[in-house]
């Protein structure tokens, strides 16, 4: 097996970062004709812009898992499509708040299988106390595992120390 990875990151103007990537896995382990198979590959692109205390970001990624039978149907995944957006604001040197929204869509090969998008919304707050940072994140998930009404909520409180 082998894999090829390509990526490009550029900062064309002050505050703007653009990135793109692609990977492809070459699978040689079974010794048979793989010409009809779907090989694993994926890619992503993203943009981030910072101006003063405000930062916004947007990204999209795709992943096609390896599949040995293109017309399997049923629940054989053709590809996943993920989209993320975020905004962060540094209120001052010690306090920052941010919001993130992510969506993941599953696409099946040749079936009528219904896939429900996974959706995630998260709010984060961090406060610096000199050598320590206290942070809290509240995240709501919908349709975990691409299953309808499989929802959850997480709250994470963390304290990190610099030594």
Summary of predicted features, one role per range:
Residues 1-163:
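Outer-membrane beta-barrel proteins
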């Amino acid at each position: 097996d082998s894999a090829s990875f390509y990526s490009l990151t550029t900062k064309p103007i002050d505050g703007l970062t653009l990135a793109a990537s692609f990977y492809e896995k070459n699978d040689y382990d079974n010794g048979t004709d793989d010409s009809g198979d779907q090989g694993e590959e994926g890619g992503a692109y993203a943009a981030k812009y910072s101006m003063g205390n405000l930062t916004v970001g947007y990204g999209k990624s795709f992943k096609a898992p390896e599949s040995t039978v293109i017309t399997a149907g049923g629940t054989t995944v053709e590809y996943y499509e993920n989209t993320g957006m975020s905004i962060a604001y540094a209120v001052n040197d010690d306090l920052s708040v941010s919001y993130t929204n992510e969506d993941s869509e599953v696409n099946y090969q040749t079936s009528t299988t219904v896939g429900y998008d996974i959706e995630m919304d998260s709010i984060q707050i961090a406060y610096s106390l000199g050598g320590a940072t206290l942070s809290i994140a509240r995240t709501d998930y919908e349709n975990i595992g691409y299953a309808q009404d499989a929802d959850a909520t997480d709250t994470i409180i963390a304290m990190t120390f610099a030594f």
